[in-house]
Amino acid sequence: MSACNTFTEHVWKPGECKNCFKPKSLHQLPPDSEKTPITHGSGKTNANHSNNHRVRSTGNFRPPVAKKPTIAVKPTMMVADGQSVCGELSIQEHCENKPVILGWNQNKTSLSQKPLNNNSEGDAEGFGSDPQQCANNDSAQKISNNNNGLTEVLKEIAGLEATPPVRGNETNARETFLGRINDCYKRSLERKIPPSCMTGSMKDSQGKHVILSGSAEVISNEGGRFCYPEFSSGEESEEDVLFSNMEEEHESWDESDEELLAMEIRMRGQPRFANFRANTLSPVRFFVSKKWNTIPLRNKSLQRICAVDYDDSYDEILNGYEENSGVSYGQGSVQSTISSDCTSPGSSFTEESRSETASSLSQKVCNGGISPGNPGNSKDIAETESNFESPPGNNEEKDESLTSKSSVKVPETHKAVLALRLQEKDGKIAVHTEKPESKASTDIAGQAVTISLVPVEEQTKPYRVVNLEQPLCKPYTVVDVSAAMASEHLGRPKIKGSSSTPNSPVTSPALTPGQINAHLKKSSAIRYQEVWTSSTSPRQKIPKIELSTGGPGPNVPPRKNCHKSAPTSPTATNISSKTIPVKSPNLSEIKFNSYNNAGMPPFPIIIHDEPSYARSSKNAIKVPIVINPNAYDNLAIYKSFLGTSGELSVKEKTTSVISHTYEEIETESKVSDSTPSKLTDCPQAKGFSNSTERKRGSVAQKVQEFNNCLNRGQSSPQRSYSSTHSSPAKIQRPTQEPAGKTEGAQGSQVPGSSSNSTREKASAVLCQIVASIQPPQTPPEAPQSSPKACSVEELYAVPPDADTTKSIPKNPPVRPKSLFTSQSSGEGEAHQTTESPTAKIQKDPSTKPVTSPPSKLVTSAQSEPPPPFPPPRSTSSPYHASNLLQRHFTNWTKPTSPTRSTEAESILHSEGSRRAADAKPKRWISFKSFFRRRKTDEEEEKEKEREKGKLVGLDGTVIHMLPPPPVQRHHWFTEAKGEASEKPAIVFMYRCDPDQGHLSVDQSKAGAEKGRAEEVLLRNSEEKKSSYLPSQIPDKACSRVTHEVAGELSPRDPRTPAGKQDGTSVTPTLPPPDLEREEEKDDTLDPTDVSPCSATYSNLGQSRAAMIPPKHPRHPKGAVDDAIAFGEKTDQEGLNASQPTPPPLPKKMIRANTEPISKDLQKAMESSLCVMANPTYDIDPNWDASSAGSSISYELKGLDVESYESLERPLHKERPVPSAANSISSLATLSVKDRFSNSMESLSSRRGLSYRQTRSIQKPQRQALYRGLDNREEVVGKLRSLHTDALKRLAVKCEDLFMAGQKDQLRFGVDSWSDFRLTSDKPCCEAGDAVYYTASYAKDPLSNYAVKICKSKAKESQQYYHSLAVRQSLPVHFNIQQDCGHFLAEVPSRLLPWEDPDAPEKAEDGTEDSEEEGKAETLGGNPEPCSETEPSQKENQRVTNRKQRSHVVVITREVPHLTVADFVRDSLAHHGNSPDLYERQVCLLLLQLCSGLEHLKPYHVTHCDLRLENLLLVQHQPGGAAQGPSPADPCPTLACPTRLIVSNFSQAKQKSHLVDPQILRDQSRLAPEIITATQYKKCDEFQTGILIYEMLHLPNPFDENPELKEKEYTRTDLPRIPLRSPYSWGLQQLASCLLNPNPSERILISDAKGILQCLLWGPREDLFQIFTTSATLAQKNALLQNWLDIKRTLLMIKFAEKSLDREGGISLEDWLCAQYLAFATTDSLSYIVKILQYR
């Protein structure tokens, strides 16, 4: 246990001895240490960093980054320099944050004491080693004394006592103290040793023992590499002492750490952010003089700049975030501290919080107790925290009590930075803080003295994230750090006080009033939103984690109050006050490697900005953030973030800007009065968190809780921290009510902060509030922390502005759910994606996550399993990522509006928990998400296992293969995960003919990244089923069409795994999904759309988002799994056995995204899969939405027009609108196209409408009908109208008949692949762009489906996705091919008749799949789930790399039996024998073609590639039953007209509706035909003219006579069509009109349709002659009207006869004729007759 005599810094464990692995402080090298600090301060960067930290932490050393609102994460991917060193250097400068003032008592005293710049290396901050040493010595002595020493030290730190003078013992006492706390923390941080001191240390602390050099007494269980005394809140108060210790420690740190860091940087390529000093690589250097803290972007995801001074400890946080602490924030106080630091480097409040929480907690942890005397308590608490997150609450309470005392004693404005070392031990995150120990020493042994570091001034400088290689960095955005910096310190300390566990309830009460006030004031000052968040991890993970940390949660809320939402978590954004990095399982789950978006959460969530930010925080400080673009794979994602921010502005109005993690800024001052209660409440909040969390589901409860909070007049912990600024009695809480619900609960405790019962009530209320709070204005992350989370949530819920509106609790709850909604879903997904991390975190907190608000958080996280962690930087196409992000962020934005109230509520559950996590130090959240995800080894392992079956991002983030595109819901292609390590792959398995096997590819979404072919698929499906439990998948997903079709989707959802793994939170998880669903509903506007899956992360990985607004699968996992397993195991196994003929396609992730999905399905997919439009093809948002987002709604009709909006738009709404519009148009207009396109809806709606109208009006109508019977003309008119109306109804009915089951767009996801089986291994049709196989769907055995295997190679897949995008932007139409699901899969060569079977077949086995998986991962590390396109591309690439070919596979409902080219070729003899019949059939086919093309026009789509081989023929019978090729005759007969389908939109042009003003200016000199793109406008018309020749067995006139196009030909130059039938002349006229060389004179496709209708059923030659001889227009009209009346009557008679003919039935021609006659008018007839006559 004793340290060796000589301290040799360990290369890989800075701060630890390479011989004894003990912290340097334990080596009795006080003289050197003391000297070193000063030296470092002056000379070394690390020293400076340390000094800065010391300066900041003047009483509570806090990482400089924590001081300033800083980018919590440094992009792991640095563009040019992969070295972290450069990044660190930049960070050093960044470290120059405003000194964070420690408000030991949370009074301004402390805060104001050390407003010095951290940069004033020992001097400004009392940086001098002597003061610190004194503090350390005192601490050491006091530590030796156990409580007394610690208490004294704390007092000294607080400035309450003259203990600092005890410098005589400086070396010994200081060293002892350092060894005990500072050392432990320092070392733990430096060494990257698990910050057992912090939180997990509670458990892990047992393993480590920090002993004072002169004593055998174990002062701490935490030996942190960077466990600097300055980091402990106790020491913080005594800046000098701490700084002495720090410097002393830092000396070693500077030398060893610097070297170690350098080595790490060089050797690992991903340096841990140790506390790099200004000259040493220190990531955070704080200089008061500098305006910005510059944080270098790192190449490694671990290398992130934490708001907290970034030490290796932070890196360790990344690696070993204690799950317990993280989740439970049991290190709540510690985490608070850390969070504060992380949240806003400049937020003293955060430090304070951290000091209190972290220091007291860490003290407890490190010391095994608050003081050496309480090691058991600490450990117990730590354990409890880890188990329940409640113990953390206790610790926090202790911390709070300490803080209360300290605060009361010392209102120093120290910039001491509390360097908390978060370490993951046993899957738990431990926060190590040295300060806490000293504080603990000062306070009673049983009590942790929490010293709150409250930055009095908004000195904290905004953080700039800059790549050390600046050329690589580009200014990205402005982040407002002012709020975070100002209010950071306020909320936390108070929370600490109130959350002080019963251990120090008395202290807590004493502390709360004044301290809280001071803190609150400060909190109000500090409003910082994390500059950037991992779109995926932060949002997704924070809420979950926060809620999970129910026990520690209460502490977190205070921190949350101060800190903005965690940078990494959009949810955090909503935190009203400072961002406190929250150790949320989600965040920790997300592993950030250097491969993960530059080690940053997928993107920096940029506080969007000035307007919103200004609104959110009155004292907003705009911090230009320079982000290394290279750090992010997709800037598009950033764009989406920015765009989201725009939306966020709305959210920000509530101040809980949901747009970003950082956005949550709440006025700390308002929370002032509730802070004490918050402190008191927090511990119980944790306890209640569990109970309340379960309750949380009911809105009533939320309201009650909220009301209770309001009644109590106390803000939730979040608010509490805000209230801290003002007196605890402040009623500002009401303003913060949303956040105040929890606050209120805790607030009531504030008055009796020491009264646990009150706290319990507060906790219960908070929990209830959390459960029921509609996300105030902040994402409901607080619930996860329970009281703390609750308060945090409320804080987040109520942004700074919201603080003033405290009185409006419900509005704040409405806090933009969008942020959290997407974030929640994203977070939830991230959690599930990083299932193991989440599960661990949640589990570590014990069942607490499940039982408590933390559980809520977990639950919500689970319910909305965060989308897979942000996919590796090369996630998915920027477009896809941006879409996801936009979705997430738009969702975040939406929550701002009261409209999201319900949504907010739901979000509150999921997001609220997230918020709780965010509310906890939001920054910590970021860290958590970064660190934790990265750090939790257990989680990582689990995640890895899970990831084995999932795509793994470059950063190690598991890109859960959520059904990549919601569209890929069909299981016949199974994406299975044979092993956890296997990637999902879609295996096409088919039986030769029905026997050989069905093409069954079970696409288990996320589970089977590496699954091997069939076995893997089968295994994967099973695994996925097992891994993704139904509980994980919300029922909502099931409700979605997609999820309905394939409940399996959710199984693939990473979130599902998370929920599943977190067995404890399974039950809670389901409710959160509901809540989340509600959120999503609000976001998506379609409740069904809210899919439980947070697909945002899956493909986007960053949208986390966000992006993502994908939600966690709502379907019960079981259902989904079952669906996946449905045909998967049996069929796949069978197929494997029967594979011989058609080897199963290597399982590959199939992009369902590109395939049309019913909107409901699509949304479900979006939510669950977060599927985005194929990234490869950045098409219209419609495309993305429809392919990625419209997975839910089958009705792309309505949706398609706005398919791009489908992601956010309720599918139901969309569909009805188009149908209404279409039906109206078709009724009102003659356009058959409208009737066709909306025929189904038109039928149902019109039929319902007109039919009902007729019924309702029938009696009056009958009366009217019988009037005027004496007037013949009147009677004739009535008969005419009756026939017309009847025909219209019949036409609509026919549409319903022929479009039966096809009006709703299907979106089959990967989960549905297992349910598909190829019925034959022989293609039913080979078209120009693909080959079609018939398939059966197990869930719809009566319907036939076709599997379309695109011929395009992987490189050309983008073209296909473009085609999909275009198609999905269109509503369903009878003559336009529908994609029911699209995937990228490895297809056996035998299924590719056009390819050489040798090469592809080799890759048909499962090994290829695994290879594919690996390749997919390699493919840029983009998580396939992120963007369907990307995954497909990946898969394509993989396939290409492998011997198998990767092809886009699409499921369609229309089973083509031949192409028009085949039909024309086979009908040559028929044309000669029966020209009339054949040419009539040609007219019918051309009419359908024109109808389909006309359908494209309103959507500005031009096919541009009309060829006979791209037109498919489907044998169609009324009722929508498509006949297979076998029953169909190669040559369709007139008796059974064939349905024509337009396919292959790869060359389609779609004009964007969005006009860029710049483009408009540029177009001022362009010709109209160019501007209007007229060159494409009538391209289809021209190509249709060519098709007329080709269908009549004539050559293309321009092929035969190329000079025609070269010269200005005229219609007369075109070849003549032989007059073989009555239709020949009309076709000639039509062809000449369509081939008019002048586009302006070329007839429209609608006119061409009218001509064809006229040729088929219109007036004949005899009528034309009479028509021409008619003298007047009236005569002509009368003539046409009479003809029309007769034709309508005849058709009515025909329908009547066919209705009696049981065998006959209505034919396709009858329907087409009915459309014509029902909507024809004399004017339209006259117009067509004129065209035919005069052209």
UniProtKB/Swiss-Prot annotation:
Residues 864-873 have a biased composition (Pro residues). Residues 111-121, 130-145, 337-365, 384-393, 566-580, 704-735, 745-757, 819-839, 879-901 have a biased composition (Polar residues). Residues 1076-1086 have a biased composition (Acidic residues). GO terms for biological process: cell migration; focal adhesion assembly; regulation of focal adhesion assembly; substrate adhesion-dependent cell spreading. It is found in: Cytoplasm, Cytoskeleton; Cell junction, Focal adhesion. Probable catalytically inactive kinase. Scaffolding protein that regulates the cytoskeleton to control cell spreading and migration by modulating focal adhesion dynamics. Acts as a scaffold for mediating EGFR signaling. The dimerization region encompasses helices both from the N- and C-terminal of the protein kinase domain. Belongs to the protein kinase superfamily. This is Inactive tyrosine-protein kinase PEAK1. The lineage of its organism: Eukaryota, Metazoa, Chordata, Craniata, Vertebrata. The gene is Peak1.
